[in-house]
């Protein structure tokens, strides 16, 4: 069968089939084989088997269309009508029909049974014979039980008759004794007639009366005893009959259960045999068919499907038949189970992400409430410490220098009164070692959407990212901006360097709003909507600037498991940092601008930083990196 048959034979074979199948429909040899089987069952009138084949194969059998051409699939293949597979199958069916013309039931008027039907008839005959044998056994058992019952009844009747005969004999003996005694009494009366008549009659009555009463009482007692014995015997007989009936019923039930089990086992064996036969037929046909599958030879596909740990199954150049014998058809049940397992894993991952996101949001809400309380406490303390000074105003956009001078003066006076509350300065100011004043109130933006201020108004500002108390609904990041204003160099009193040089302990919780640390990035709902596990997320290295800030940032740094974890750090783009910091130093502002911080993300693109600072979310920085593609691969990411 390795060479293709001539075309005239294939045409004759195709004419015999009502709906031929060609390679144009599918490149999968298994699907084509199933299609041929389906058409064969349909043409031979086996519609039930055809439907069962469709159900078992999950409707993967390609069906013919109503067009005159036969099939409408636009698969790549030769333009010839008579392809190799069509010719081969046509020749195969023609040979089978010529060898056994009785295979087709539609053209079988003589009623000769096919081998399949013969097997079915034989199985039915065997089942009938087994049932008949079981019925005969049951009948024989029933007959034996009936004979035993009849024998027992005869024995009981004989016993009763014997007892009745014995009772009659006793009664006759009693009657005879009575008659003999009466005769003796009559003789005694005749002999004693010479005596007084009254005395004789009394003596006779006294002698006769006790004897008659005793005899009657004894007869009654014997009758009662006999009746009681008969009742006991009847009860025993009834109990024995009930026990026998129960035993018979139990035996019948056991026999029925055994029959049912045998039938079930037979059915299972038949189903297994059918499945094995069907799989063998499919495997042999798929092994023998030399059709090209998806543009690749079948031998290569079989080599790919084999495990690498079985070198004995690898094909040799001399033996190509071993490759065909090692193929295994993929069952649809395993495919369904794998899909169900994958969906369950996705659901579990989503549930874990949702629970972790809720925990994160709850922690952030508590953190925001703590910050608000700290702000209120700091405001109350500042008001109590400086009762004669007005509260320091919070510059929103740092537009003028007059507001900067007023805030710096208020800060100097507050530092003179309470040097403990203004202990720390930013990391950027420590690197440059220039005197910079920081306002007492946290200069925080009202909304988290303003990520960068205007270029004209940001000459004296160091832009960094921080965790914002509000979650954005649109963006990928939420930032909090803190601004820092350089002050003109002014003569400072002697108490100021002392307050700066001294390292006094202070309440770090009250100074959380006065810090400008390296800013951490927060991922909001848009990032967590992906199927990612937070436990598997590797965080990035953080700068060491947060190590000397005490315990004030414990709430900020303990987002996961309350440990000092590594964080993601952003900085301004290099071009913008180079453009802004020289302008700050050139204005004579006294050491403006902080040190440039390294950008750990090369694949992350931020905005141009030229937003107007009006609170528009459209100008916020956006991460353009595809996180899902970079977090690994799997069945769902192919």
UniProtKB/Swiss-Prot annotation:
Q: What are the subcellular locations of this protein?
A: Cytoplasm; Nucleus
Q: Which domain of life is it from?
A: Eukaryota
Q: Where is the composition biased (Basic residues)?
A: 412-423
Q: Where is the composition biased (Low complexity)?
A: 296-328, 369-387, 394-408, 425-465, 495-515, 572-585
| One GO location term (cellular component) | nucleus
Compositional bias segments (type: Gly residues)? 586-595
Molecular function GO terms recorded: DNA-binding transcription factor activity
**Record GO biological process:** cellular response to neutral pH; filamentous growth; filamentous growth of a population of unicellular organisms in response to neutral pH; positive regulation of filamentous growth of a population of unicellular organisms in response to neutral pH; positive regulation of transcription by RNA polymerase II
InterPro entries per the record?
LisH
What UniProt keywords are attached to this protein's entry? Activator, Cytoplasm, Nucleus, Transcription, Transcription regulation
Task: Mark out the compositionally biased spans (Polar residues).
Answer: 8-26, 283-295, 466-481
LisH domain: residues covered:
29-61
- Region (Disordered) residue ranges read 1-26, 187-216, 270-331, 362-515, 572-638
The record's listing under PROSITE patterns reads:
LISH
Query: Subunit details for this protein?
Result: Interacts with FLO8.
State the family it belongs to: Belongs to the MSS11 family.
Q: What does this protein do?
A: Transcription factor that regulates pseudohyphal differentiation, invasive growth, floculation, adhesion and starch metabolism in response to nutrient availability.
Q: Give the protein's recorded name.
A: Transcription activator MSS11
Organism source for this protein? Answer: Candida albicans (strain SC5314 / ATCC MYA-2876)
Gene behind this chain? MSS11
């Amino acid at each position: 069968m390795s060479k293709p048959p001539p075309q005239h034979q294939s045409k004759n074979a195709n004419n015999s089939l009502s709906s031929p199948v060609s390679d144009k429909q599918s490149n999968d040899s298994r699907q084509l084989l199933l299609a041929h089987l389906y058409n064969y069952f349909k043409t031979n009138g086996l519609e039930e088997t055809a439907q069962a084949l469709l159900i078992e194969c999950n409707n993967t059998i390609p069906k013919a269309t109503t067009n005159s051409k036969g099939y409408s699939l636009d698969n790549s293949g030769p333009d010839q009508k008579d392809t190799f597979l069509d010719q081969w199958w046509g020749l195969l069916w023609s040979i089978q029909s010529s060898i056994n013309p009785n295979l087709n039931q539609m053209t079988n008027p003589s009623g000769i049974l096919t081998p399949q039907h013969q097997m079915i008839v034989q199985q039915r005959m065997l089942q009938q014979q087994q049932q008949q044998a079981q019925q005969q056994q049951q009948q024989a058992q029933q007959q034996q039980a009936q004979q035993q019952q009849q024998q027992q009844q005869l024995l009981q009747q004989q016993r009763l008759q014997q007892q009745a005969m014995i009772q009659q004999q006793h009664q006759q003996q009693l009657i005879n004794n009575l008659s003999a005694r009466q005769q003796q009494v009559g003789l005694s009366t005749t002999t004693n007639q010479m005596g007084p008549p009254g005395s004789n009659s009394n003596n006779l009555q006294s002698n006769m009366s006790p004897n008659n009463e005793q005899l009657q009482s004894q007869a009654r007692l014997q009758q009662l005893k006999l009746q009681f014995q008969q009742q006991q015997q009847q009860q025993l007989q009834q109990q024995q009959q009930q026990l026998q009936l129960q035993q018979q019923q139990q035996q019948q039930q056991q026999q029925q259960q055994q029959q049912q089990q045998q039938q079930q086992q037979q059915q299972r064996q038949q189903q297994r045999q059918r499945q094995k036969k069907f799989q063998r037929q499919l495997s042999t046909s798929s092994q023998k068919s030399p059709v090209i599958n998806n543009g690749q030879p079948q031998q290569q596909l079989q080599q790919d499907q084999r495990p690498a740990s079985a070198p004995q199954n690898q094909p040799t150049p001399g033996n190509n038949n071993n490759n065909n014998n090692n193929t295994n058809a993929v069952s649809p049940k395993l495919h369904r189970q794998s899909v169900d397992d994958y969906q369950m894993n996705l659901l579990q991952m989503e549930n874990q992400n949702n629970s972790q996101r809720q925990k994160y949001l709850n922690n952030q809400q508590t953190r925001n409430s703590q910050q608000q309380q700290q702000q209120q406490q700091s405001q109350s303390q500042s008001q109590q410490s400086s009762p004669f000074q007005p509260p320091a105003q919070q510059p929103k956009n740092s537009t003028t220098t007059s507001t900067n001078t007023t805030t710096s003066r208020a800060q100097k006076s507050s530092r003179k009164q309470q040097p403990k509350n203004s202990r720390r300065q930013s990391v950027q100011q420590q690197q440059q070692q220039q005197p910079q004043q920081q306002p007492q109130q946290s200069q925080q933006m009202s909304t988290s959407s303003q990520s960068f201020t205007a270029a004209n108004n940001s000459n004296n500002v160091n832009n960094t990212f921080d965790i914002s108390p509000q979650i954005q609904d649109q963006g990928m990041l939420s930032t909090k901006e803190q601004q820092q204003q350089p002050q003109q160099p002014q003569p400072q009193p002697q108490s100021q360097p002392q307050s700066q040089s001294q390292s006094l302990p202070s309440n770090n919780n009250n100074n959380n709003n006065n810090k400008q640390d390296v800013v951490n990035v927060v991922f909001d709902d848009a990032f967590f909507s992906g199927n990612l596990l937070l436990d598997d997320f590797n965080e990035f290295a953080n700068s060491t600037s947060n190590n000397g800030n005490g315990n004030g940032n414990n709430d900020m740094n303990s987002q996961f498991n309350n440990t000092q974890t590594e964080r993601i750090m952003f900085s301004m783009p290099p071009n913008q940092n180079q453009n802004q910091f020289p302008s700050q130093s050139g204005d004579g502002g006294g050491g403006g601008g902080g040190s440039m911080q390294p950008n750990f993300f090369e694949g992350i693109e931020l905005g141009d930083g030229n937003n107007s600072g009006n609170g528009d979310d459209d100008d916020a920085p956006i991460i353009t990196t595809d996180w899902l593609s970079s977090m690994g691969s799997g069945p769902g990411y192919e």
